[in-house]
């Protein structure tokens, strides 16, 4: 995005499983909450450091941080709150996040520079897919799409933070991706 005074950066980063550390298992073969092996406080802290370092490199390269940052594969609010306290964000960034109904607990989020961005509204867009089971615990869901309206220098910006279902298992999720993309297109055309 460019205005007459300066160039602003917008970024998207799939942080690949930014989950809170697991409690130590009783037995080494016990399943973990995150689903990751040996996901402890040390590895979690290292992951946060590496993510913040990526943005430090962007700052050094571009002489500025992105004013808007879409993130995917986050589990919950706490990792985001911890990330924005670190260098180079230094608590100057706000967080927009909603817990999704994704079976792995994977969410998307938006970080924004509080000195440049005014949040007007935000909402998760949740998708349910048909299954032959009426028990809500068995619904086929995926991560939410995050829709935000923000204001920058008097201009309204509409954003969708999207992390589509993966292309795994012979692309079983293609109909889901197609449905979500069609829905987003319809929403964009109505803006």
Please describe what each predicted stretch is.
Residues 152-191:
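Extracytoplasmic, non-cytosolic globular domains
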Residues 23-24, 122, 169:
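Short capping/connector residues at structural and topological boundaries
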Residues 2-10, 22, 116-117, 140-162, ...:
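Beta-strand-turn-beta hairpins that frame and shape the catalytic cleft
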Residues 43-51, 140, 176-183:
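Soluble or luminal CAZymes and related metallo-dependent hydrolases
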Residues 20, 128-131, 167-169:
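A short local loop/turn or secondary-structure capping micro-motif enriched for an aromatic residue
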Residues 52-59, 149, 185-189:
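Generic structural signal for well-ordered alpha-helical scaffold segments
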Residues 1-86, 90-92, 96-102, 106:
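N-terminal, active-site-proximal structural segment of metallo-dependent hydrolase catalytic domains
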Residues 70, 74-156:
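Structured beta-strand-rich core segments of catalytic domains in phosphoester-bond hydrolases
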């Amino acid at each position: 995005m460019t205005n007459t005074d300066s160039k602003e950066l917008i970024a998207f980063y799939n942080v690949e499983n930014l989950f809170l550390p697991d409690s130590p298992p009783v037995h080494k073969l016990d399943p973990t909450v995150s689903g990751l092996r040996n996901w402890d406080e040390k590895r979690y802290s290292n992951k946060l450091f590496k993510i913040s370092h990526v943005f430090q490199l962007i700052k050094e390269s571009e002489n500025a941080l992105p004013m808007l940052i879409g993130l995917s594969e986050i589990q919950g609010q706490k990792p985001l709150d911890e990330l924005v306290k670190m260098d180079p964000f230094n608590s100057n960034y706000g967080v927009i996040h909603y817990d999704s109904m994704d079976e792995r607990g994977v969410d998307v989020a938006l970080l924004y520079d509080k000195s440049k961005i005014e949040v007007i509204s935000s909402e998760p867009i949740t998708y349910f897919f048909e299954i032959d089971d009426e028990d809500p615990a068995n619904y086929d869901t995926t991560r939410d799409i995050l829709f935000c309206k923000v204001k920058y220098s008097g201009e309204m910006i509409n954003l969708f933070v999207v992390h589509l279902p993966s292309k795994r298992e012979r692309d079983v999720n293609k109909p889901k991706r197609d449905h979500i993309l069609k829905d987003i297109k319809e929403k964009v055309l109505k803006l």
